[in-house]
Amino acid sequence: SVGFKAGVKDYKLTYYTPEYQPQDTDILAAFRVTPQPGVPSEEAGAAVAAESSTGTWTTVWTDGLTSLDRYKGRCYHIDAVPGEDNQYICYVAYPLDLFEEGSVTNMFTSIVGNVFGFKALRALRLEDLRIPVAYIKTFQGPPHGIQVERDKLNKYGRPLLGCTIKPKLGLSAKNYGRAVYECLRGGLDFTKDDENVNSQPFMRWRDRFLFCAEAIYKAQAETGEIKGHYLNATAGTCEEMIKRAVFARELGVPIVMHDYLTGGFTANTSLALYCRDNGLLLHIHRAMHAVIDRQKNHGMHFRVLAKALRLSGGDHIHAGTVVGKLEGERDITLGFVDLLRDDYTEIDANRGIYFTQSWVSTPGVLPVASGGIHVWHMPALTEIFGDDSVLQFGGGTLGHPWGNAPGAVANRVALEACVQARNEGRDLARQGATIIRNASKWSPELAAACEVWKEIKFEFPAVDTLDKKKG
């Protein structure tokens, strides 16, 4: 037969193309590749391109029925990782026709599918994606975005304040609603369902939604401010999830919530579409992310999950704290925080950004700082995250010695003091502790909080760090 030669041939003969110039419409991926001993970097990079696009382990005669040159992924550039003996950043370009429009699910099934179990590689990590403008425009993106959210809430010029209700499991709906009310009347903008609060025997979802709505309306009437509680609509089926979102809308509350990784991108995109059509804000929790993103040499970096969320849809997403109890190196964290909020981000190796990314006016997502933070962290958080963020204090509100409402007062006073000091041109990084101490002189609630948490720190080295040359 003409043009078909059976057998196995090296991937690099077809899929390693250093002369290729990436197209504006290509999806570009940066993979951290650790080949097995004896496997050259070109073969490893080509194998990744092949297995995540049109290739398989042997030549097949049906290759002749299509144009492989049109559809194949191409490994077009390889950099050795500084400080590592056998690790490479392999850049792969994928033609846009390989992907279904508006489907994060399909994009990930191709790019981070079977290839991650490939035997020729010891480890593989997807570090970054460049999503082309042509593909971004097939997604709705966040239901509303940062500016529309501020307009809905009538809150400007400062970060928003939140609190996760604790204990996360075990409260009855009535007591849960009471905790929500105390936090909101004390000065918080939002309270939050914990990510694992769905509809358990001790508190069914419908009861929780009702008592939380009552708490919201009561707190709004007392404070004159718009309040919200992230009602977790995550459920065992998509139909049940939408049913819960519909009930939230009927109650007239402003925001619902979804666990986007455990719930899945298909469910998340459906919920985001519903939220846009029905005026609901959508808070996103990233439960399960560390299973995927914590190891430096295998898995997928959170910046990729963040980009995927901006495509799929969400108005808030948890993004680490830099200063609290959960993983997050400052430069890396700020890199993906900007990817969430900004319309255009330049390539920047110092922040782990491998590609220049334009979002063509896709709404931005508010990063949420949450996990082990308290009033002494407020100056650093205000400086690091800026106004367009949500600062969430769970234990840092509910752990106040006088109760929830005073805990909320302490956080609000600390935030307002930091914002005022920043607006006056003071250096929050250097003068933060002084700013908090001065504010506590006229707020007994803040003074009590300062006393409780004055010694608490979570200081461990980050696992996921930038690559630096040895020596």
From Swiss-Prot:
InterPro entries: RuBisCO (IPR033966), RuBisCo_large_chain_AS (IPR020878), RuBisCO_lsu_C (IPR000685), RuBisCO_lsu_C_sf (IPR036376), RuBisCO_lsu_fd_N (IPR017443), RuBisCO_lsu_N_sf (IPR036422), RuBisCO_lsuI (IPR020888). Binds 1 Mg(2+) ion per subunit. Its cofactor is Mg(2+). The record marks K325 as: Transition state stabilizer. One of its GO terms (molecular function) is magnesium ion binding. The modification N6,N6,N6-trimethyllysine is found at K5. It is found in: Plastid, Chloroplast. Its main location: plastid. NCBIfam families: PRK04208.1. Belongs to the RuBisCO large chain family. Type I subfamily. Heterohexadecamer of 8 large chains and 8 small chains; disulfide-linked. The disulfide link is formed within the large subunit homodimers. RuBisCO catalyzes two reactions: the carboxylation of D-ribulose 1,5-bisphosphate, the primary event in carbon dioxide fixation, as well as the oxidative fragmentation of the pentose substrate in the photorespiration process. Both reactions occur simultaneously and in competition at the same active site. This is Ribulose bisphosphate carboxylase large chain.
